[in-house]
């Protein structure tokens, strides 16, 4: 992001810095996004509410449901999965008028029984991450993707693109894998996780704790002001 900002001359280079490892506020890995603290009964209640079985493999996304986030590619990739009767696509977020999805994709999301569309969720995201087996963000651009960090803190493998912001938000091959916007590539990488169990989510949690925990970011902010 810093490199692009300097190249695009958004501000003088000597007035721009990267705070810590690139996130403006960090995330609370100790008291909020911590799988050890999740109330399992609440997770069970959410599973019942959304019709998700323990045996289901849940591919998750959180955020605005718009073209810019790669939702079209994600839905098409989900349609292409083979031997996927036990797969669910969990979309936590809401449709928007600006950059709206095509009507056919929107209708598919609303009507496919394997796709769970929650609409706007006000808090408790740690419980929705607890329903997922994999987090996918096929975005075209980001500042710094908070959902990618939160999901890794919840020990989820992550698939995301190599675009600005996202390219610094996973440890490639360890906490997640990079994808393109090609649905076939997304399918291939989903199956690397779903069938081959290539990524161990526990590494992702430790990586996020090390570099993006909010307390460490706050220390960097304090140093900046001093």
Model-derived features with residue positions:
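Short hydrophobic beta-strand element within catalytic cores of glycosyltransferases
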Residues: 157-160
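Short, structured helix-loop element that forms part of the nucleotide-activated donor/catalytic region
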Residues: 90-117
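A short, well-ordered alpha-helix in the C-terminal region of glycosyltransferases
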Residues: 48, 198-211, 223
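Conserved donor-binding/catalytic core segment of Leloir-type glycosyltransferases
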Residues: 53-69, 75-78, 90
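Donor nucleotide-sugar binding/catalytic pocket of nucleotide-sugar-dependent glycosyltransferases
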Residues: 1-43
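Conserved acidic donor-binding segment of nucleotide-sugar-dependent glycosyltransferases
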Residues: 172-173, 177-183, 192-197
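Aromatic "clamp/platform" in nucleotide-sugar-dependent glycosyltransferases that forms part
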Residues: 140
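Short alpha-helical donor nucleotide-sugar binding micro-motif in glycosyltransferases
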Residues: 120-122, 127-132
